[in-house]
């Protein structure tokens, strides 16, 4: 297919499915915590705006959560179908870590999700709030285990290799491997920031259409406070993550910087733009700032950054891809910080909700957090190449050995099915977003004499009336 080998098609297939999948957990993590904050504020203040926002976003959360679970199952199967040699080699580490995620996180979420989505007016307020908090904690615990497994593949430790297989010898070292704290923090904050801009974009859309309600204003206000406070923190965390990567994966940093060779003892420049050429072993048309590379990456003007030519050609990541994916991530991060600062300036002037240029920026920034997450994952995963487990197993040795025809057919099927099914799901979720928050009316529906109506499935928490308009009596209730 297009002159690609089976291993390349397997990588493209996994990249496609995981790129689709990560969008949903990122929003799930952020929305779960956002819902917990909204319900907590409602219980404390009794301000109905928080309650109305809770019921509005809980419906969107239900749809997003369902799509995240389904897309995650596909990825799990691929470890066995497409990457069986990797599973055989490292399964003693990755298998238990993913099992811990199911036992501690997924079961916690599943146990309280029903109460959270369908328990309003059926359980006490404190119990319902507790359920929402447990779901939020469950999403973070899930992030913990998934990032631990992935980080171990980046910086493996706490193991022995016996008979060609990884055998864990120190589970604490496995879980808390050198890159794990930085990657966990970076990803969790990224999920919060991505959700903030998703929420802020939704509010901006309604304000631009003249729907200036207290609930919409509160959405925008909370989103911009999050952007203002957390986006700069993400930049600092990213800096520490970069220092950790320089220590443990210097070839990745060299590829990200497009830095091919050091000249004498001269400090490393920072290449702002250019086109890395893997064949010619140089970065063409580069625009650089002298010394700044050393200052940013080593916090010193006396040290140099390792160069790509210091590594064997077969051990070098594809510099062209990670060079630009990293810059997309950083550029979006800077734009997020700018948006947060602009919102503060407008807030002080009293024009946060009426400045159309700002509202248009907030609207278009809606997907920025998700795009930045994808760019960041492309950087870290492609930058790990040619290794699937850094320094231990090459990606070329990890695949199941399927034919080009098999991988081509399944890749095409995945693309078609994903765009149809998840396209429909995303369209439905955007339909809910466009409706906006409405006033919630306390009402307990009944399905028969002495029986309350009970939703039959999680996605039925996202309720719409027949005329494509919300019935306030049904907000937050099931079919």
Kindly label every feature range from the protein language model.
Residues 1-479:
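Polytopic transmembrane helical bundles with strong interfacial aromatic enrichment
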